[in-house]
């Protein structure tokens, strides 16, 4: 195994690129030429993606422990170390982060018209912070990365968003910050008891925390991650954020940021409070079932494409939480697979909506119709992404939902059948969306002048389409990566 600090490279390469853009390009005579900023951003994202692919290739899935571990002293007095590593659960999210960031940066080169330098800087910062969060083995370091993500996403929505972007950005910030306060208080208590933030050390001493304190701790940490997923009733920020965010912002929001909530449950909440997690699991399961049905029904009534996909995300993440809190290998494996699959499918759907918006400058479903006759390639891509979203066998969407339902069936049959109704509702609203946008007669004359996908749009969308199919046909190649890590996680259950 190569002895390079490969995880540090993946984390700091985007940050170094940001510093180069801000300190050198901005101060040079080339500052008025965004092309140089674009070169740096693309090169940085390509190299970061290559570094994460290297980690995946060299990763030993037969070893459930952390690999590529790096540990450096930082602020010992408060227990903060730069302690990073990857296991089977985190490695695929690291790759997903670098992959989606690369796609977003490439797409942004052709669609963002103002403040391109600042826009790309925000995405590079987001990439660095997300990889840092997914690889942190120190709880305080995880918190710092987890919260740092807030700032660039707030700026992306607030500066490059739609008409009501300020409201959406502020709502996003306040909701997430609200959850962060509970998380911070939890960290203070943990350090007062353990005198360490090392996750591997903390999880060995969880029995030393009194039961009542564990219960309070559980709810505090649960709220922090429930806001991020989001679980009802902490969900209302998401539709507004998606509708107002630029296309690439929606891709990162749905593809990566929501996954940090589910990842937080797996990485922090379950190992820290195993007995209390089992005690309160029934409440999470019913909240998840409510989220699946409620979000699906609300999605049916939407007239805005992005808002419909946003509510579908809430429903799909409901399958993630029921899988996690089933405490079964099938359920947890399904939840992880569902997060990865949803990251790909939702990103693809938002990119497709973005291509339509670039042409007609509206996301209102009623303004479309008959688009397939003018954009057959887009129609084919949309069809595959839509079928993946409804969980058709042979697509990635089927595997995650099936395993999550299989896991929860072993512990709660009633919740399983109610959650399964969400699949039916999902098929209804996604087929309805496809029919109204792509099929039928052209009623809007502007659609007559539509041109099919440009090369950069194909480059952005096609890899996601291939992944939807690959994940669906070859799920074992993904499941095997985190199989032993899931077993290791569930030892206390």
From Swiss-Prot:
It comes from the Bacteria. It is an enzyme of class 7 (translocase). GO terms for molecular function: NADH dehydrogenase (ubiquinone) activity; ubiquinone binding. One of its GO terms (cellular component) is plasma membrane. GO terms for biological process: ATP synthesis coupled electron transport; electron transport coupled proton transport. NDH-1 shuttles electrons from NADH, via FMN and iron-sulfur (Fe-S) centers, to quinones in the respiratory chain. Couples the redox reaction to proton translocation (for every two electrons transferred, four hydrogen ions are translocated across the cytoplasmic membrane), and thus conserves the redox energy in a proton gradient. This is NADH-quinone oxidoreductase subunit M. It comes from Rickettsia conorii (strain ATCC VR-613 / Malish 7). The gene is nuoM.
């Amino acid at each position: 195994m190569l002895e390079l600090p490969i995880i540090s490279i993946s984390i700091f390469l985007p940050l170094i690129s940001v510093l180069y853009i801000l300190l050198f390009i901005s101060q040079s005579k080339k500052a008025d030429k965004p092309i140089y900023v674009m070169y740096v951003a693309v090169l940085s994202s390509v190299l970061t993606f290559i570094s994460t692919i290297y980690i995946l290739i060299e990763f030993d899935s037969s070893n459930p422990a952390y690999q590529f571990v790096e540990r450096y002293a930082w602020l010992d007095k408060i227990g903060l170390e730069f302690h990073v590593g990857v296991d089977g659960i985190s490695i695929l999210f690291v790759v997903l982060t670098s992959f989606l960031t690369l796609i977003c940066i490439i797409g942004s080169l052709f669609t963002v018209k103002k403040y391109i330098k600042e826009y790309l800087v925000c995405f590079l910062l987001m990439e660095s912070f997300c990889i840092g969060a997914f690889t942190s083995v120190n709880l305080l370091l995880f918190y710092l990365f987890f919260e740092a993500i807030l700032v660039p996403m707030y700026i992306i929505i607030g500066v490059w968003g739609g008409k009501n972007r300020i409201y959406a950005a502020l709502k996003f910030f306040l909701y997430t910050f609200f959850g962060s306060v509970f998380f911070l208080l939890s960290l203070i208590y943990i350090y007062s008891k353990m005198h360490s933030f090392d996750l591997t050390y903390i999880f060995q001493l969880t029995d030393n925390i009194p039961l009542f304190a564990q219960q309070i701790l559980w709810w505090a940490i649960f709220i922090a991650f429930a806001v991020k997923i989001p679980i009802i009733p902490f969900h209302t920020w998401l539709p507004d954020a998606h509708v107002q965010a630029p296309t690439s912002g929606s891709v990162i929001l749905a593809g990566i940021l929501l996954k940090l909530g589910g990842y937080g449950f797996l990485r922090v909440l379950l190992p820290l409070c195993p007995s209390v997690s089992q005690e309160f699991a029934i409440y999470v399961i019913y909240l998840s079932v409510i989220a699946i049905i409620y979000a699906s029904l609300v999605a049916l009534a939407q007239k805005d494409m992005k808002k419909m996909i946003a509510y579908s995300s809430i429903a799909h993440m409901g399958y993630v939480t029921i899988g996690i809190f089933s405490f079964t290998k099938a359920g947890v494996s399904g939840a992880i697979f569902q997060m990865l699959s949803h990251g790909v499918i939702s990103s693809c759907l938002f990119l497709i909506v973005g291509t339509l918006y670039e042409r007609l400058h509206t996301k209102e479903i009623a303004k479309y119709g008959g688009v397939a006759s003018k954009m057959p390639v887009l129609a084919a891509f949309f069809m595959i992404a839509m079928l993946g979203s409804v969980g058709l066998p042979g697509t990635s969407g089927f595997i995650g939902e099936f395993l999550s339902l299989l896991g929860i069936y072993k512990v709660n049959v009633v919740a399983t059948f109610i959650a399964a109704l969400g699949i039916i509702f999902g098929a209804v609203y996604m087929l309805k969306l496809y029919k109204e946008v792509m099929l039928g007669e052209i009623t809007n004359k502007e659609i007559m002048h539509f041109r099919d996908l440009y090369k950069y749009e194909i480059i952005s969308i096609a890899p996601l389409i291939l992944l939807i199919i690959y994940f669906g046909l070859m799920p074992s190649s993904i499941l095997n990566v985190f199989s032993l890590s899931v077993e290791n996680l569930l030892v206390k259950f």
